[in-house]
Amino acid sequence: MDQIQRKQSAILGAFVADAASLGFHWLYDSERIRQLGGERPEFREPCEADYENAAGYFAADGKTAGDSSHYGAQMKVALMSLHECNGDWNPFHYQSAFCQAFDRGGWFSGYIDGATSGTLQRVKQSNEELLEGALQAAG
């Protein structure tokens, strides 16, 4: 297996792992996961009742088994950006693609965690500061 195949396999594995774990994503009770999932907990249909009286947070409302979490969506944004930039990393393109996915009206539908929300805020603030500086420089 060459280096490109290893990278492709790692990315594919990350997408599969994200989708396989969605049913118990953010359920922090390993005994409960064992009770509900048994020997094959992967690709469990997300169910809010699984989280009742357990440590964790149900964040998969509207999702079905095999869907991606917001982490999978973030990987998709990164790969789409790399593809659109011919394999080159362009942080400005990635930031734009990230905002198009996760900001209000974006294509991602689902739970937005604090890190994603904070990233959106920092990108907006940075863009506002850049625009303000450009306007001041222009005179």
Describe the predicted segments one by one.
Residues 1-139:
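Structured, active/binding-site neighborhoods that engage oxygen-rich ligands
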